[in-house]
């Protein structure tokens, strides 16, 4: 029977170092308080006794070599083996990431501790100095509280960089839309409402009209044929009817003072150009995201009906490598999609279910809840039915389906198989599964073709490519890529 520890938050890697050492005195803890120019370092043993007082180390290659040299000297002096040494500091920012990575490349174990937890370990809560912060970090490391296996590495790290960059560009795009609304409300009130102008807001026909000589008076005076030609070249359907509706509406709105029109038009033209640039950058990032997603286990999330590339990439990037990730129960708490529970008064005491915790990975939570909403609208039949049942029962359906989706997704990524309906998971015939694969294959292929990443996704060296080869061999079918 597996022994369970009451210290569930302790790092397995750090616990193994303590177990291998003869005594905790033969463990060297290198606590680091990162900074942009000079880090503060302190050596102590596993019992908490300081072996070397805090000293500074430059955030340079020379600083890395100097620190390693000092560690070797302390190991020789205190007769501590190299494999019983580990480094640790608060989850570092971008300016210290290369420093920690250099230590890992030299073969050292580098742990990261949560800054908020480290703050609670300090002796003095009122003040904050490098030395006080260092003591809190050292206590966290001695208590084996640290993350030694970053899940976001390699392809997962590259994917997370792209996902978070795209997320910020989407925020900028929303901000730009709001600014354009403010300008349009003065030049041509109501133009961005489809029921008024007949044009869907911020699509190409709408942008073409806004980027040059745009005001209610100018749209009203413009020749009908010129406006029809402009809308037709922009790809608008039924341009004649839309041009007529637009000019009729322009004759019935309030117009701005003439002395302000030129300035507002210049501002709007710049906004349209910036908006186009942001949209082009987002499209480029999505194509790159699809290529990196295809090289990870997260590609299997795309096989769930209702889940597209953006949602699959977002969840995969924040979870990281499923092989090194914690159990699903920990991930659910990490994502902030499980309510807090309070119970007291013995076995007969009542249980209070509160709201979800605010301390979580908000980005992962956002992508999971969005995925749950999509599954409730467009997902597999069993998931849509479950979403409706939870909603009818007064539960938070999106949170419930998000937890179920996370369990399903982790199982798919760890076992390298696509999503199967409930009736095909157990006691299903070979013919039933063969038919399911042949029916769903065109839809799966179209998802990847949308981003031009289908050849990468189904390459023999990538997870979906290996799954495709296995299915073709076992079920004697052909799943064509072209």
What label would you give each PLM region?
Residues 138-161, 250-256:
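A short, charged helix-loop
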Residues 55, 104, 111-149, 207, ...:
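Short alpha-helix plus adjacent loop in nuclease-associated cores
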Residues 167-297, 426:
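Glycine-rich, often acidic, oxyanion-interacting loops/wings at catalytic, nucleic-acid
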Residues 47-86:
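Nucleic-acid-processing active sites and adjacent nucleic-acid-binding tracks
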Residues 346, 350, 387-482:
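Low-complexity, acidic/Ser/Thr- and charged residue-rich accessory regions of DNA metabolism proteins
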Residues 235, 300-303, 309-393, 397:
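Phosphate-backbone recognition surface of nucleic-acid-processing proteins
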Residues 18-45, 137:
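Gly/Thr-rich phosphate-binding beta-strand-loop-beta motif of the actin/hexokinase/Hsp70
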Residues 1-22, 283-284:
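Charged, flexible boundary elements
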């Amino acid at each position: 029977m597996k022994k369970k520890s009451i210290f569930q938050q302790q790092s397995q890697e750090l616990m193994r170092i303590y177990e291998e050492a003869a005594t905790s005195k033969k463990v060297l803890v290198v606590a680091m308080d990162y900074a942009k120019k000079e880090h503060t370092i302190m050596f102590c043993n596993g019992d908490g006794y300081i072996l070397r007082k805090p000293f500074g180390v430059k955030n340079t290659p020379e600083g890395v070599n100097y620190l390693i040299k000092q560690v070797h000297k302390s190991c020789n002096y205190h007769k501590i083996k190299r494999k019983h040494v580990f480094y640790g500091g608060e989850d570092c920012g971008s300016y210290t990431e290369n420093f920690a990575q250099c230590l890992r490349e030299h073969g050292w174990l580098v742990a990261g501790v949560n800054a908020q937890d480290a703050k609670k370990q300090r002796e003095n809560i009122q003040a904050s100095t490098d030395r006080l912060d260092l003591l809190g970090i050292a206590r966290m490391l001695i208590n084996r509280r640290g993350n030694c296996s970053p899940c976001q590495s390699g392809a997962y790290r590259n994917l997370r960089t792209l996902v978070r960059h795209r997320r910020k560009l989407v925020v900028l795009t929303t901000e730009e839309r709001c600014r354009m609304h403010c300008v349009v409300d003065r030049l041509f009130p109501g133009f961005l409402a489809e029921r008024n102008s007949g044009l869907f807001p911020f699509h190409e026909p709408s942008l073409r009209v806004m980027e040059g000589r745009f005001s209610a008076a100018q749209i009203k005076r413009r020749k009908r044929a010129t406006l029809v030609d402009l809308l037709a070249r922009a790809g608008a359907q039924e341009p004649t009817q839309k041009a007529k509706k637009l000019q009729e509406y322009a004759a019935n709105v309030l117009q701005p003072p003439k002395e302000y029109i030129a300035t507002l038009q210049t501002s709007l033209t710049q906004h349209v150009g910036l908006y186009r640039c942001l949209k082009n950058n987002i499209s480029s990032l999505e194509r790159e995201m699809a290529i990196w997603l295809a090289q990870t286990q997260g590609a299997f999330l795309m096989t769930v009906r209702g889940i597209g590339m953006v949602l699959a990439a977002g969840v995969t990037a924040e979870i990281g490598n499923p092989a090194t990730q914690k159990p699903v129960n920990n991930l659910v708490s990490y994502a902030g999609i499980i309510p807090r529970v309070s119970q007291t008064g013995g076995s007969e005491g009542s249980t209070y279910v509160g709201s979800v915790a605010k301390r979580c990975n908000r980005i992962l939570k956002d992508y999971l809840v969005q995925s749950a909403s999509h599954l409730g609208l467009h997902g597999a039949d069993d998931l849509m039915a479950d979403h409706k049942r939870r909603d009818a029962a007064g539960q938070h359906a999106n949170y419930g389906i998000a937890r179920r989706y996370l369990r399903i997704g982790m199982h798919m990524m760890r076992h390298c198989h696509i999503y199967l309906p409930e009736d095909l998971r157990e006691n299903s015939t070979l013919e039933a599964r063969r038919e399911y694969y042949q029916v769903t294959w065109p839809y799966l292929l179209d998802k990847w073709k949308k981003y031009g990443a289908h050849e990468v996704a189904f390459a023999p060296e990538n997870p979906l490519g290996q799954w495709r080869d296995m299915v073709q061999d076992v079920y004697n079918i052909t799943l064509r890529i072209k």
